[in-house]
């Protein structure tokens, strides 16, 4: 059953179900439950939390509860690019190993799409799309690819970059921002363009970005995660 309510609300719980024979029919028979297929093996289901906000593990099964994931601790060391030989490989044009015709996916805290390291030589974005799961803005634009949040495609990102170049507000076109900087750092290391003496591993690659929303409070409570610690749901990833 498709979801006709806001699955991002705090009073909606999420769980992961293996698509065994009869699982789909069992979900459809439940009242107030909606589901969406993650792939050929897994189903993500959503329903209203009980009033006490406690998960009934005995009936649901621990494996159905989305696990929480955090960010890499500490600062990334970009000197590793040289140590793994990435810069030496890029210097050999005959290898054509700059990531051209490759699409790299990032599921993280978002990306600073205005940063020059994500643009090509003409100043256009190399980002093909950004799915901002945190975007709750009402819009008339159809969400073709996602059940919540907002998907921005390449032409919209280029429009935002052009606005920024003209002294306008780019975020009126593409509102997504990487307030943490973690996603931007990871993307720049792996796919940063040649900029001010810096280059990533695959400067010719295109990027596909997901900005994850923070996990719901009931899962933080269940796993004893502090409120000030970034945590992301397995079902969103």
Question: Whereabouts are the PLM-identified features?
Answer:
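Autoinhibitory propeptides
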Residues: 1-103, 110-126
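Subtilisin-like serine protease catalytic core
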Residues: 91-233
């Amino acid at each position: 059953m498709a979801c006709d309510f806001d699955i991002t609300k705090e009073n909606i719980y999420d769980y992961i179900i293996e698509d065994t024979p009869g699982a789909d029919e069992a979900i459809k028979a439940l009242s107030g439950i909606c589901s969406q297929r993650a792939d050929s093996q897994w189903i993500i289901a959503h329903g209203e939390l009980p009033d006490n906000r406690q998960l009934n593990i005995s009936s649901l099964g621990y494996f159905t509860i989305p696990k929480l994931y955090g960010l890499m601790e500490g600062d990334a060391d970009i000197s590793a690019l040289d140590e793994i030989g990435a810069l030496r490989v890029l210097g050999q044009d005959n290898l054509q190993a700059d990531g051209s015709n490759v699409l790299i996916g990032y599921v993280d805290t978002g990306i600073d799409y205005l940063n020059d390291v994500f643009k090509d030589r003409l100043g256009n974005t190399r980002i093909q799309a950004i799915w901002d799961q945190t975007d709750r803005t009402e819009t008339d634009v159809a969400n073709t690819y996602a059940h919540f949040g907002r998907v921005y495609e390449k032409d919209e990102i280029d429009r935002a970059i052009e606005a920024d170049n003209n002294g306008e507000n780019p975020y009126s076109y593409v509102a997504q921002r990487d307030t943490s900087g973690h996603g931007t750092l990871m993307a720049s290391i792996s796919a940063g363009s040649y900029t001010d003496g810096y280059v990533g591993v695959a400067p010719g690659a295109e990027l596909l970005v997901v900005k994850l929303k923070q996990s719901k409070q009931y899962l933080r409570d269940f796993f004893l995660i502090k409120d000030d610690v970034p945590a992301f749901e397995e079902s969103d990833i």
